[in-house]
A protein has these predicted regions:
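Radical SAM [4Fe-4S] cluster-binding motif and immediate context
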Residues: 16-161
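Glycine-rich beta-alpha loop elements in corrinoid/cobalamin-binding modules
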Residues: 1-13
Length: 161
């Protein structure tokens, strides 16, 4: 049976990153990718039902931590590990534009700006303000979900675009 979803992700503690020695991981990223990096997850799940995607872990429900909670974790990451960049490992980081605006404001209030890369969908970048917010936040690379020039293929994959 499916386990119940945790509705309030802010109630969870931050990952216990001190439980492992991060130096080898930071060094490996720097050696092989030119910058040290630490992952950060702001949400669980994805409401889209694309047929090719894996929903085995969090399913189709989308739950997100508050901007203030994520900004607090980011401050902890910067203070303890000072990575050159972060990887927002969400399924679709730009799923909520109002959340993104609030998160940018929360980081700005803390004086934090760190280069990052993330994953999203092309249809979540059609708003010029969203692209501006990502740039302001420090985004330098976006990994886009699989798309096609064929509407028949998009429909078969249930992309919803």
């Amino acid at each position: 049976p499916e386990r119940p979803k945790i509705p309030d992700l802010d109630a969870l503690p931050f990952p216990d990153r001190a439980a492992i020695d991060h130096a080898p991981y930071l060094d490996a990223w720097k050696t092989h990718h030119g910058a040290s990096s630490i992952n950060l997850v702001t949400a669980r799940g994805c409401p889209y039902r694309c047929t090719w995607c894996s929903h085995a872990v969090y399913g189709f429900s989308h739950r997100r931590r508050s901007p203030a909670n994520v900004a607090a974790e980011m401050a902890e990451i910067v203070e303890r590990y000072d990575p050159d960049q972060v990887w927002y490992a969400d399924d679709v980081f730009t799923i909520s534009h109002p959340w993104l605006e609030a998160y940018v404001a929360a980081l700005r209030a803390r004086g934090i700006r760190r280069p990052f890369e993330t994953i999203t969908r092309a249809d979540r970048l059609q708003n010029e303000d969203t692209v501006r917010l990502l740039a302001e936040l420090g985004c330098y690379r976006i990994w886009l979900g699989s798309e096609s020039g064929s509407q028949r293929i998009l429909d078969a994959m249930e992309r919803g675009v």
